[in-house]
């Protein structure tokens, strides 16, 4: 049984006295772990998360179901508590992918999760699935490196790296190689299950890094045995959830910034765009030109130049460690635009997934719609705000970076609504999440609430997942026809 580090004690004064006596008794030799992180997230104050979780009565049943399912309440779930409607859909989908009988065995499911998370060096997700893989009786030799896994899983490595970094390169030939590999062949149902898992964990790595998720105290990298350096800090504070005094402002306190009119200016632009839609629309040629311009300009907002040093324990789970995201619009490289009017999730991908992996298409569709349409009609301190224009700009910008175009969308809106710091953040979280820093998180939408920034990360995660699925499912459709 794991005791929560957030369980409050009724008599901290008595415990502190006992702690003091125990600490002075060197003969005991007890090593007490101390959490390295302050709460579930490095970016979001712990008090805001815990306060929200305690105020929403419905969250108790959601948490209970999640704990029953997985035997844990992980920090991703705790950060998603800001958006309970989405969280319920997310947990339901993840439960179906991992807990219900499907084309793939539990060992394969969790190993694919390890492979996917490893592409972005997401040790948090890798460690979760290593534990689950072992729990389900997986062969621990596989964990020594991808070369020790069955050939069938190793064959999935090429699709994994393209899906994670350059999904526009996936063709029906890649699908054929997996389906026609002799004794190591995948069935169509197995491949759909694998692709959904890969896309799920690539995008979940984006959310993990985008929200600065901390490892739990019992996980690798989640604790230390060194004494705290903050004065007047007692070991029993660990169980009270008090991890020191530095790091975050009290709940409700907003840092003063130079951008005091940032929110108001954005709201004015949104209103102008919404009111201007009744005016004469641009021609199809002009709309296409604006898309190409936005796609090309997206390369200006480069991800951080410095690659984080590879984690040996993580990188062993995939091949070709140098393979990463590349701007498809760089000079000398041209990839045809993916027109949603020709192949969309609603008209093509949804039915294909549902046919080969029943009910999953419905669950994914519900999750996409909740993330896309989620709104509380608020922006920072303002209420009764229609945020649909802004949400659509964020979603379509992610797809634009992947070369995916909506014919009925004016891409000129993106430049009006998304400033440079926000575009840099989006590109890092979606394309190279392992490079995301607190500086980037703090640097965009400085007057907005943490719950709103978490909402942004939900949009980025789901837009990325749908983009990956569109390319992979289109390749399968082309193979089948």
From Swiss-Prot:
GO MF terms held by the record: L-leucine binding; oxidoreductase activity, acting on peroxide as acceptor
C-terminal domain: annotated segments: 310-481
Catalytic activity: a hydroperoxide + L-cysteinyl-[protein] = S-hydroxy-L-cysteinyl-[protein] + an alcohol
Chain spans, region Disordered: 295-316
A Pfam family that the UniProt record links to this protein: PA26
Transmembrane segments: none
Subcellular location field: Nucleus; Cytoplasm
Lipid metabolism found in the keyword field: no
EC identifiers of the protein: 1.11.1.-
Keywords: Cytoplasm, Nucleus, Oxidoreductase
GO terms classed as biological process: cellular response to L-leucine; cellular response to leucine starvation; negative regulation of TORC1 signaling; positive regulation of macroautophagy; regulation of response to reactive oxygen species
Active site: 122 (cysteine sulfenic acid (-soh) intermediate)
Protein origin, superkingdom: Eukaryota
Gene3D superfamilies: AhpD-like
Annotated region (N-terminal domain), positions in chain: 63-244
Domain commentary: The N-terminal domain may have an alkylhydroperoxide reductase activity.
Protein name: Sestrin-1
Species this chain originates from: Xenopus laevis (African clawed frog)
């Amino acid at each position: 049984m794991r005791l929560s580090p957030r369980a409050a004690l009724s008599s901290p004064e008595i415990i502190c006295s006992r702690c003091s006596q125990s600490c002075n008794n060197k003969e005991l030799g007890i090593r007490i772990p101390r959490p390295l992180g302050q709460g579930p997230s490095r970016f979001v104050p712990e008090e805001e998360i815990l306060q929200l979780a305690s105020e929403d009565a419905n969250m108790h049943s959601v948490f209970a179901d999640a704990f029953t399912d997985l035997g844990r309440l992980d920090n991703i779930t705790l950060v998603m508590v800001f958006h309970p409607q989405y969280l319920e859909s997310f947990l339901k989908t993840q439960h179906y992918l991992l807990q219900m009988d499907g084309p793939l065995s539990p060992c394969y499911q969790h190993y694919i999760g390890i492979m996917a998370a490893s592409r972005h060096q997401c040790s948090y997700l890798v460690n979760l699935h290593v534990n689950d893989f072992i729990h389900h009786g997986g062969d621990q030799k596989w964990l020594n490196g991808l070369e020790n896994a069955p050939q069938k899983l190793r064959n999935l490595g090429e699709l994994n790296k393209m899906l994670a970094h350059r999904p526009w390169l996936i063709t029906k030939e890649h699908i054929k190689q997996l389906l026609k590999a002799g004794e190591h062949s995948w069935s169509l149902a197995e491949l759909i299950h694998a692709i959904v898992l890969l896309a799920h964990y690539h995008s979940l790595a984006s959310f993990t890094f985008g929200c600065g998720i901390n490892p739990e105290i019992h996980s690798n990298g989640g604790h230390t045995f060194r004494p705290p350096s903050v004065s007047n800090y007692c070991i029993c504070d660990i169980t009270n959830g008090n991890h020191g005094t530095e790091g975050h402002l009290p709940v409700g306190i907003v840092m003063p910034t130079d951008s005091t009119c940032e929110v108001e200016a954005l709201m004015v632009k949104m209103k102008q765009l919404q009111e201007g839609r009744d005016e004469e629309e641009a021609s199809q040629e002009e709309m296409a030109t604006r898309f190409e311009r936005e796609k090309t300009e997206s390369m200006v907002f480069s991800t951080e130049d410095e690659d984080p040093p590879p984690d040996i324990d993580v990188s062993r789970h995939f091949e070709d460690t140098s393979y990463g995201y590349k701007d498809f619009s760089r000079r000398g490289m041209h990839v045809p635009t993916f027109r949603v009017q020709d192949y969309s999730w609603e008209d093509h991908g949804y039915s294909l997934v549902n046919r080969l992996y029943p009910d999953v298409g419905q669950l994914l569709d519900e999750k996409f719609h909740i993330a896309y349409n989620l709104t509380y009609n608020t922006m920072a301190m303002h209420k009764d705000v229609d945020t649909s224009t802004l949400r659509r700009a964020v979603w379509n910008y992610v797809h634009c970076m992947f070369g995916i175009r909506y014919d009925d969308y004016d891409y000129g809106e993106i430049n009006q609504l998304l400033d440079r710091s926000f575009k840099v953040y989006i590109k890092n979280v979606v394309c190279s999440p392992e490079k995301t820093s607190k500086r980037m998180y703090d640097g965009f939408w400085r007057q907005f609430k943490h719950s709103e920034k978490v909402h942004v990360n939900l949009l980025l995660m789901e837009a990325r997942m749908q983009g990956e699925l569109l390319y992979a499912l289109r390749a399968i459709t082309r193979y089948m026809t």
